């Protein structure tokens, strides 16, 4: 496997990928993502509903954008090492049924690739891809304990609400 240090020499590509392709490769990143941001990990375990994701993908609702380091390949036509993703859903909003909204499910960039513009470029690609699908408004959330809101402010997004969470299980 060829290797390249992340950073300026890396060639990061952004693309839409099918669920089955991206999900299989994303397992390691998903666990790392969960370890980094999830609250109540001792009570609520990561258990991805693969069937539901596949159903949403089959219906054309799910959109997966991946970020890959093209310098790290296993073989000649390998698209590169998966270093990040954005999973979103394209749906009419329940209050605005005539308009498509892009709703972020999750997004993640491997920590080694967070310096520079990788996150900004990922969301620029997401914006373009969603717009091409007819989306008129994008919605996402950030964790307060891992706040990356400055990326969205830079991209012209507006902070519009706060959400609250409370564990009420046993």
Which residue ranges define each predicted feature?
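A short beta-loop-alpha structural element at the N-terminal edge
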Residues: 10-28
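Conserved GNAT-fold acetyl-CoA-binding loop/helix
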Residues: 24-27, 31-53
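A conserved beta-strand-loop-helix scaffold within acyl/acetyltransferase catalytic domains
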Residues: 44-64, 69, 86-97
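Glycine-rich phosphate/pyrophosphate-binding loop shared by adenosine-nucleotide-utilizing enzymes
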Residues: 72-85, 102
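A short, internal acetyl-CoA/4′-phosphopantetheine-binding micro-motif in the GNAT/acyltransferase core
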Residues: 105-115
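Conserved acetyl-CoA-binding loop-helix of GNAT-fold acetyltransferases
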Residues: 115-128
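Conserved beta-strand-loop-alpha-helix junction that forms the acyl-donor binding cleft
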Residues: 138-149
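Conserved catalytic-core motifs of GNAT/GCN5-like acyltransferases
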Residues: 141-142, 158-169
